[in-house]
Each structure stands twice: as C-alpha cells, then as structure tokens.
Amino acid sequence: MIDQNLLRTNLDDVANALKLKRNFILDVNQVKALEEQRKTLQVTTETLQAERNARSKNIGAAKARGENISQLLAEVDTMGNQLEIAKTELDKVQSEIRELLLTIPNLPAEEVPLGKDDSQNKEILRWGTPRQFDFEIKDHVTLGENLKGIDFPTGVKLTASRFVVMKDKIARLHRALAQFMLDLHSEQHGYMEVNVPLLVNHDTLYGTGQLPKFGEDLFHTQPLTGQDPNEVQRPYGLIPTAEVPLTNLVRDEIVDEDSLPIKLVAHTPCFRAEAGSYGRDTRGLIRMHQFEKVELVQIVAPEKSMEALEELTGQAEKILQLLHLPYRKVLLCTGDMGFGSAKTYDLEVWLPAQNTYREISSCSNMWDFQARRMSARCKAKGDKKTRLVHTLNGSGLAVGRTLVAVLENYQNADGSITIPEVLRPYMAGQEAITG
C-alpha cells in the first residue's frame, strides 16, 4: 500500500506516475472527494469531542454550585449522539480510502526501465553456456515418462489437469533439490528455516497484497457440500507462495532494529488457480496448480533494502551456479513487474527442449508497500519513533522448474539422467537415473 500522504501532497504527480509506469488509472476526483470528506468529518468529530468535554466539566462545576444541570445533561447527551454519528461516518470514509489504497500498485524505483511488457525487460547478465547436444533432445515430460517417474494421467485422475504424480528416482531427485536449496540457504546464506501453515486467513493475504485484487488466483477453502447453512465457514486461502506466511510473521509487530535483517527460508507446496493462463504451458511441469518452492524473505531497515535485493538475488543465482545450469538475469520493466514490487529481477534458466530461457526465480524489493499494509515496524534503541520496515522476497528456487532444467540439461542419449554432483549426497551417492 502506498503512503496516503503522497496522495495528499502530490496527488497529480502520483496519478501521472501510475498511469505512465503502471498503466493504472487513479480516479483523482474520487481521491479528492474522499479526502475532503475525511477532513470535514475529522474537524467535526474533534470539535464535538472538545465541546462535549468542556460541557461535561461544566456539569461538575454547576452541580457543585447547586444549580439545575438537566439542560446541560441534555446538551451533553445530544452532543454524544452527534459525535457517535460523526465517528461512524468518519470510519466509513476512512474505510473507503483504505479500500481504494489497497487497489493501487506500488511505484517503481527510479532505475526500473520504462516498458509495457516483458519484451522491454533489460538483460543484466548471462551465466554459463548452453550445452550442445549431439543427439535429439527430449523434453522433461518424455524423459520423466520413459523413466516411469512422471505421471500426468494419474494426476488428472486424482485431481484434474495441471496436477502430477512423481515416483521413485524422479520423486527423490525432486526432494533432493529442495533439501539442497534449504541447506545452502540456511547453512551458508544465514537464513532461518521456518515451517509455516499452508492455509492462511484473509488478513494474511491482505498483508502481502494477494487480496483484494488477486482473489481469483487463489484457492479458497469452503465446506464440501455447501448446502447446510449451519456448517462452519472456513475463510482460508491456500498459499500461492511461502512469501505470504513468512512476511506476515512481522505483521502488527515492532522489531528492534538491532535484530535486522531478519532472513527467513521455507520449503512449501504452493497453490495457484492460474486464472487467465488458459492454453499456456499445457504440457509438463512449468505451470501447475500445485508445485513446490523454496522461498527467501528478508525484513530489513529501509536504507538497506536495495543492497539486500542484490544479496538475495545472488543467493538464488548461487543455486543455479552450483547446479551448473545456464541462466540469465533480467531487470523487469515497469509494465512487467508484480503489483507490490518496487524493483524485480527475474532469473531465467536455459531449457534445451524449448531452446529458450524460462523464469525460475523472481526476486523483489517491495519497499514499505507490504509493511504499511501489515503495520510492520522497527525501532532503534533509545528512539521513541517507529518506522516501517522494508520487505523482500524471492524464489530460491522453484523446485519443479529446477527439476525440469536438471532433467533436460543433464539428459543422455540413452534417456538416462546424470545427477549433478552437488545432489549426489542427497541421492545416496547415485550418479545417474536409468530406466
């Protein structure tokens, strides 16, 4: 959520920036009308409160003098009723302002390139050289099915399309990737591993920006029958990423600045409805309703957040480097960034069967956008004032997509898969997966 004071002091500039950089049309007249109502009602409530307090004191003095206080009591009661009405109206207007603020995207950092879509993203670097194959390349689906380790038909039978069953050595390789990522981030990069709920309430989803704007992308819980009005309602959402519960750990908290940065990592299943992606990536593991991811989150002091973004992105890159997977690092343009991000790097891994780079990690600095929604603050020792923290998040990495990259980049002519050296300790020393 952007700072409401920006709308009060620089409304036209903010509106122009949102239109230019975010293709978001802010209704300036609506903002002005709500702000005028808020100021008027604020003055009214403060005036009524002051007058009511003054007359309440007069009642005590008049009573001490033995005067008739019935008229004063009636006036105080009337003012009390007027005050309650004014407070109710003020609360309503403030609620409308908050609902409006919750729909406004973050303002990009100055260095973010202007652009409409991913074609105008800026490539920062490439690492590694794509392997040259001397045999016909198979995609991960064919490789996995031939090894009897990837089973999409059973996933459809059990649930629906975009679900999968993994078996045997492929399932173990998938698990090995997640364990390798967790170990590297927790043992070498200084992150604390956290096990979080997969179901979260609406306050949590509002805190990180999934609600109210992206509810259709979430899976929500509800009674299976939906017929009995006496059934207990369970208004929870399945997490689309561990960023949601991890970041919300500091919601409504004031943390000691000496404890910053807070660096958290979690390995979780993630659930996404993939609304609007019909027909895209229908084959394989690239776009699933359920997938696993190792997520990195940092909570930092405001002046440290850009430095932290470089660090976090580099830590995600380290996974790809140790796996010897070619990738490129891309700075997203204004038109391709996420709703709450101020600056985002994407890491895209080379997939031989597609002959292209595909996103495997997105690392973002949210500035104080999420912190303001969550009321997540920090305070220095000896300082009475608090300030909003900055939050960052990134995939370190998406496990399923990393599996895709390993299968395709490490395939052999006979259909076997060479296991990357760093994963062999997690695979009982096995060097290859064979049929």
UniProtKB/Swiss-Prot annotation:
GO cellular component, one term: cytoplasm
Annotated EC: 6.1.1.11
Gene Ontology MF term list: ATP binding; serine-tRNA ligase activity
Keywords carried by this UniProt record: Aminoacyl-tRNA synthetase, ATP-binding, Cytoplasm, Ligase, Nucleotide-binding, Protein biosynthesis
Positions with a binding annotation for ATP: 272-274, 359-362
The keyword Isomerase is annotated on this UniProt entry: no
Pathway where it operates: Aminoacyl-tRNA biosynthesis; selenocysteinyl-tRNA(Sec) biosynthesis; L-seryl-tRNA(Sec) from L-serine and tRNA(Sec): step 1/1
Reactions it catalyzes: tRNA(Ser) + L-serine + ATP = L-seryl-tRNA(Ser) + AMP + diphosphate + H(+); tRNA(Sec) + L-serine + ATP = L-seryl-tRNA(Sec) + AMP + diphosphate + H(+)
One GO-annotated biological process of the protein: selenocysteine biosynthetic process
Cell compartment(s), UniProt: Cytoplasm
Main location: cytoplasm
Xref: InterPro entries: aa-tRNA-synt_IIb, aa-tRNA-synth_II, aa-tRNA-synth_II/BPL/LPL, Ser-tRNA-ligase_type_1, Ser-tRNA-synth_1_N, SerRS_1_N_sf, SerRS_core, tRNA-bd_arm
Binding site for L-serine: 241-243, 295, 395
Free-text function comment from the UniProt entry: Catalyzes the attachment of serine to tRNA(Ser). Is also able to aminoacylate tRNA(Sec) with serine, to form the misacylated tRNA L-seryl-tRNA(Sec), which will be further converted into selenocysteinyl-tRNA(Sec).
Subunit structure: Homodimer. The tRNA molecule binds across the dimer.
Family annotation (PANTHER family): SERINE--TRNA LIGASE (PTHR43697:SF1), SERYL-TRNA SYNTHETASE (PTHR43697)
Notes on the domains: Consists of two distinct domains, a catalytic core and a N-terminal extension that is involved in tRNA binding.
Protein name per UniProt: Serine--tRNA ligase
Gene: serS
